[in-house]
Amino acid sequence: MLKCKICEKSGIFEKFDEDVIKCKKCNSMYYTGSQNKEIPRVVSVTSNLKSSAQKKNSQLIARSYLQYLKKKANIDFENALDIGCGFGDFVEELNKIGINAGGIESDEDTVKNAKSHVSHGFFDELYDSTIKYDFISVNQTLYYFEDSFVILKKISDLLKPNGIVMIATVNTESSFRQEHKIWTQGCKICFGNEVWKSFDKFGLKCIDITSYDDNLFIDFFLNKSNMMSKSQFLKNLVFYVSKIKKLFVYKDNGINNFILLKKF
């Protein structure tokens, strides 16, 4: 009988889609297909227009990340590392407020188009542990790793005492995701909400879980699913860029979660 890789309970699964199952005990979800899909690139190598839109989106998201962090944590960090940093916009936002921040990104094409302080590389249990950090972020990235537990343990090893980990990730308990069967391409595993509260073994304590809707992601999905016109999608995009509408909206049962973990 199949056992959940997260809570280790048996026989408690429900099918989410063709290749994804959900544990009814811990609400974690994971891909079960024989060959996972390629992790999507951040940067488009085929369209300058698409790349420009991606960069603008990245800037909007980075500012929203910083707004959340300022709201929930004391950000007097000396240094920071952003894992899977994409174009490096969140890294840049951190540097603007006096934090010595750097980022690591695995896709070479993205790094070529990235801001300064971004280096090409891969994060795993062998990542250099010489430097210790006050703050580490891994946003919309943790679910791409084969073993998220190994990655969290490594992150804990890299943190200074009382250091903070910020994670933006999928909310597996979102009714919108459940209704529309939304699974992120390349995703391996997503933890249920209660799982985030059980990382004492890594020296990490959960200090916040905040659910939110990424409205641009929702609009993009609705447009691709022919539930929103292209003109309305583009109009909303202008509203987000001009700050007439909020990109991120905090709400119960949002499609994503912010997680804050503290090293003890």
Where are these regions (language model features)?
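Conserved N-terminal segment of class I S-adenosyl-L-methionine
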Residues: 1-131, 135-139, 149-152, 252-258
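A C-terminal cap/extension of S-adenosyl-L-methionine-dependent methyltransferases
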Residues: 210-264
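Short conserved AdoMet
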Residues: 115, 146, 160
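Short glycine/proline- and charge-enriched loop/turn segments
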Residues: 44-51, 175-185, 224-228
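Short, glycine-/aromatic-enriched active-site segment of Class I SAM-dependent methyltransferases
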Residues: 166-190, 194-199
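Conserved S-adenosyl-L-methionine
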Residues: 15, 204-215
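A short glycine-rich, Lys/Arg-flanked "PGG" loop and its adjoining helix->strand segment in the class I
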Residues: 149-164
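A short His-aromatic
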Residues: 140-144
